[in-house]
Amino acid sequence: MDPLTAIAASGMRSRTETLDLLANNIANAGTSGYKADSESYDLYFGSDAWDGFHQNRPMGAEMPLVQRNWTNFSQGTLMDTGHMGDVALSSEGFFVVQTESGPLYTRTGHFRIGKSGRLETEDGYAVRAVGGKPIQLDPAKPFTISTSGQVSQDNAPVGNLEVLSVDTVDNLTKRGGTYFMLSPGAKTSPAKDTEVLQGKVEASNVEPTQAAVKLVGVLRQFETLQKAVRIASEMGKEAVEQVAKVG
C-alpha cells in the first residue's frame, strides 16, 4: 500500500470511530444521566508507528488512530419531574446499584419499587443502601427520600441511599448507556456536600447542536479522505500503465 493510501485509510478508520461515537451521543441526548463520550488520538507515539519508522515503513500507515474514548462527567441540567421515583444528585457522586456481576455506578435516578418490594432501577438492578444491602419497601405505599438520602415510608426510615464519590473518574469504565464499573483497587468515599433531590432527574450532558455540527465536519473529512484514496488508486493505475507501455 502506498503512503498516501495508507495515511488516508488510517484517517478514514479514525473518522468512522468518531462518527459512531458522535451518533451514539446524539441518540442519547434525551437519556437521563447519560455522559457524553469523546475521543483522543494517538498521532505519533504508538509502538506500531515507531516500529514502522525504524523499519523504513511509512508511519502514516499507523496514524492517526483513536487511542481511547473518554467520558465527559460534567453535570447535566437538573429537571423537575415531580415523580416519586425520580432522584437526582446536586453535585458529585454516584448512586450504587447491584448486578449479578457486581456493583455499578450511575447518575441516572429513575427508581421504582420492584415486585419483590426492593427499590430498583428501570433495568431491575437493586439500588443499594449504605452498607450494600437493598432497600425494601411496601409496594402499596408511597415513599420519600430526604436530601441526605434517607428513604422513608409511613414516616419511618428504611435505609439511606449509598451515594459514593470515586478517587478519580479515570477509574470508571462505561458499561451500558448510563452505568459505570469501578476499576479494581480504586477507592470510593461517601459523597460530601451532595444533596439527594427527589422529584428531579439529571438530563444528559450531550450538547446536541454541538455534536451535530461536529458530526457534519467529520463526515466532510471522511469524504475528503475517500477522495484521496480514489486519487491515489487512479495514480497507481496510471503508473502501472506507463510502465507497461515502456516495457
Kindly give the residue locations of the regions a language model identified:
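Amphipathic alpha-helical polymerization modules
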Residues: 1-247
